[in-house]
Regions:
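N-terminal targeting/anchoring "stem" of glycan-biosynthesis enzymes
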Residues: 2-449
């Protein structure tokens, strides 16, 4: 009797355990099935919470989403985008974000190959896809913003001209309300909304830095520009290796274990040296209006502060990104501290690369050279410098670096117009939490590492 009872009990327990095992297996399968679905749902946010901080995802995850939110049959047209490369990038991004607010595809805008305020009679339009990769942009910004071509138009419902307001009475709130109203009703029924008036750089700003950064990350220069920039960087590093190899050769006489000179690293510093005539006039007026004396920097101040960034033990090439045509001072190559070897385009013998391109392309090449430099030093009131620092900040952020204070980091940037530690320039990272692009568009002395 006892044996029979024990046998029944064993079978009962065995059945229960088997049932429990199947339930556990089913639960595991359910979790594995639902996991990618849940991850997909939450990845659309672009940012997840981790230890109460915003964790900015990698480039591929940040921009991965579907394209359902951007209408392909409704378009926004904007005025020709003008001024320098930096202003045109901001104007383009603002046009993209305006199109996003209206849930429309932005018709590919015309850029300007020449400086508007310097060459009014010689303004040269240049197609967007002569500067940036069109298909690459739509691929990287898929689901966020979208570019379209005029060939996509069906011309069924005509064009609605939207006049942008101006003057003091045209406030940020009024501008935003106009855009909201244009996203619905009879205005939205038109195939194309054409904004008339000021160029997009001068429009009111309604978006945080992070949204601009998403657009900037999608802007990839065409291969021709990237190759030209690679040629300049290769020349800089080649000269750096030659100069360092001489130092290594001298040292090798004293130390037989010295590493082969052919393997010597050749880091370089890029300095966006704003000492041109037009800049000095502009910054002096800006200092007078604002009461801030940390905008202009003399070449002596720049040389001294840059010289306090690195040691003078090994020779380091300093590439001077300067608008040669606007420069009225050939002495920028003299007076640098020991160990710093300055080169501008002519001394580097790459001026021929720049001369065969219009102003916008020349600026794009310099932008890439500054972005690829091991150390970048610029002016915090220069939009060009600010956009270079933003790109370098994004590189560091993707590496998990959130600040550069007191530590050695990859892609460090500095502002020479603001004093930092040890009489050097102030370390500089873009504040990705800013609610607008004001500091980048117009400059600021409130920067930090």
């Amino acid at each position: 009797m006892d044996l029979s009872s024990n046998s029944k009990l064993s079978r009962l327990i065995g059945c229960h355990l088997i049932s429990l095992a199947w339930k556990c297996l089913a639960l595991v399968i359910m979790v594995l099935f639902l996991r990618p679905v849940l991850l997909h749902l939450f990845s659309g946010c672009g940012v997840i919470e981790w230890n109460n901080q915003d964790l900015i995802l990698s480039h591929s995850l940040l921009l991965s989403s579907n394209d359902e939110g951007v209408r392909r049959e409704k378009f926004l047209e904007v005025p020709q985008i003008v001024w320098g490369l930096n202003n045109q990038k901001i104007a383009f991004a603002r046009a993209c974000l305006t199109a996003r607010m209206l849930n429309r595809t932005l018709l590919i805008p015309s850029l300007s190959a020449s400086l508007f305020y310097k060459e009014i009679d010689q303004l040269q339009p240049i197609s967007f896809d002569k500067v940036f990769q069109f298909d690459k942009f739509n691929s990287l910004c898929n689901g966020f913003v979208r570019l379209g071509r005029y060939l996509d138009l069906k011309n069924q419902t005509g064009i609605y001209d939207l006049q942008k307001g101006s003057g003091r009475k045209w406030t940020v709130e009024r501008d935003k309300e106009q855009l909201k109203q244009s996203s619905r009703g009879h205005v939205d029924e038109h195939e194309v909304i054409r904004i008339v008036g000021k160029n997009p750089f001068l429009w009111h700003d309604h978006w945080p830095v992070k949204e601009y950064a998403r657009v900037f990350e999608c802007l990839v220069f065409v291969d021709e520009i990237l190759k030209e920039a690679d040629k300049v960087v290769s020349k800089i590093r080649h000269i750096g290796r030659k100069l360092r190899s001489k130092t290594v050769t001298v040292q090798s006489d004293l130390n037989a274990d010295t590493e082969d000179s052919s393997k010597a690293a050749a880091p370089f510093i890029a300095v966006h040296m704003r000492v041109e005539i037009d800049w000095m006039i502009h910054c002096k007026k800006l200092e007078q209006r604002s009461g801030i004396n940390q905008i202009c920097s003399s070449k002596q101040e720049i040389m001294q502060r840059v010289g306090n960034i690195v040691s003078s033990e090994s020779p380091t090439v300093v590439y001077l990104a300067v608008a040669d045509s606007l420069l009225n001072d050939s002495s920028i190559l003299r007076g640098w501290m020991k160990g710093l070897l300055p080169f501008e385009k002519k001394k580097l013998r790459v001026d021929g690369i720049y001369k065969r391109h219009p102003y916008l392309i020349r600026s794009a090449i310099d932008y890439m050279v500054c972005s690829m430099a091991d150390i970048f030093v610029g002016n915090s009131y220069s939009t060009f410098s600010s956009l270079v620092v933003l790109e370098r900040t994004l590189k560091m952020t993707r590496m998990g670096i959130r600040n550069s204070c007191g530590i050695d980091v990859r892609w460090p940037s500095y502002a020479y117009n603001i004093p930092g530690e040890s009489n050097g320039p102030q370390k500089w990272m873009t504040n990705m939490s800013d609610s607008s692009l004001q500091a980048i568009s117009y400059g600021s002395n409130a920067i930090s590492c």
